[in-house]
A protein has these predicted regions:
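Active-site-adjacent structural elements in enzyme catalytic cores
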Residues: 1-170
Length: 170
């Protein structure tokens, strides 16, 4: 139902797995994803082996959704960016733990209600934590990289203002 798409699955490695410990952070777990982007799928078919690839962002920063975001983040530290257009989702992949009873480890492009309906699990499972150090799980992961003020009545001239409220019913 969700593959290919913006979802990653945490699985237990087989004892004699050929997956590098560098990829798994010395864990016996691995996250697997089936991307939907046509360029990524073409690359995976051409190389004919699994590919380990992080998000194109510096740790603890917001994930890029366009080529320009990547260039802005890395500047001259990178030589090229594969142009595939802007992200259709704009968020990281949802990460599902499939070791034991399925549960959501990180919310992302697929909402929890849809996933929990699919795996027929209770929302209480979402609170269960798996002791895994994985990309995107840091409390700083979605930090914008600039100071933020909450519950501001009036913004300063050099600040943006985001209003969050319930939508009015039509």
């Amino acid at each position: 139902k969700f593959c290919p798409g913006p979802i990653s699955f945490v699985l237990k490695l087989k004892k004699k797995s050929r997956v590098s410990k560098i990829i798994t952070n010395n864990s016996n777990l691995v996250a697997v994803r089936f991307p939907s982007h046509h360029l990524t799928r073409k690359i995976l078919k051409e190389i004919d082996y699994p590919l380990a690839a992080p998000s194109a962002n510096i740790s603890s920063s917001i994930s890029p959704v366009s080529k320009q975001d990547v260039i802005d983040e890395f500047g001259n530290k990178i030589k090229f960016v594969l142009e595939g257009g802007s992200s259709k989702v704009g968020l990281e992949s949802t990460i599902i733990n499939l070791v034991g009873k399925p549960n959501i480890l990180r919310l992302g492009g697929i909402d929890s209600k849809t996933i929990y309906e699919f795996i027929k699990s209770s929302k209480n499972n979402q609170k269960r934590e798996l002791n895994v150090k994985m990309p995107g799980s840091s409390k700083l992961h979605y930090s914008p990289g600039i100071p933020m003020r909450l519950n501001v009545k009036k913004n300063n001239d050099d600040e943006a203002f985001i209003l969050i409220r319930k939508r009015k019913k039509k």
